[in-house]
């Protein structure tokens, strides 16, 4: 089980990304627009720097929904390989069967 603080921090980051994504995208578009004067683009850069760092999408870490484990994460199932194996053996993941040949 992952530390509760790490899981909660990641949840807080997801909320910040949801709140600031539109504003960040608008500022980035302004910064990348070559037709605008350099002063206006620089002001947009300063405003972007004032936004919280945790509001950036790259700060989010994919974590297992069951255990909170950050590594060996399957995106489709939103869980780690360990949780997948445990729940798969119990028959709680639809379509997962133990292989035999």
Curated annotation (Swiss-Prot):
InterPro entries from the entry? Ribosomal_uS14, Ribosomal_uS14_bac/plastid, Ribosomal_uS14_CS
* Compositionally biased region (Basic residues): 10-20
What is said about its interaction partners and assembly? Part of the 30S ribosomal subunit. Contacts proteins S3 and S10.
Q: This protein's superkingdom?
A: Bacteria
Annotated spans, Disordered: 1-20
Task: Spell out the molecular function terms from Gene Ontology.
Answer: rRNA binding; structural constituent of ribosome
Matches recorded under Gene3D superfamilies: 1.10.287.1480
Q: What is this protein's function?
A: Binds 16S rRNA, required for the assembly of 30S particles and may also be responsible for determining the conformation of the 16S rRNA at the A site.
Q: Name one GO cellular component term.
A: cytoplasm
Q: List keywords of the entry alphabetically.
A: Ribonucleoprotein, Ribosomal protein, RNA-binding, rRNA-binding
Q: What is this protein called?
A: Small ribosomal subunit protein uS14
Species this chain originates from: Sinorhizobium medicae (strain WSM419) (Ensifer medicae)
GO terms under biological process:
translation
The Swiss-Prot or TrEMBL record describes its family as follows: Belongs to the universal ribosomal protein uS14 family.
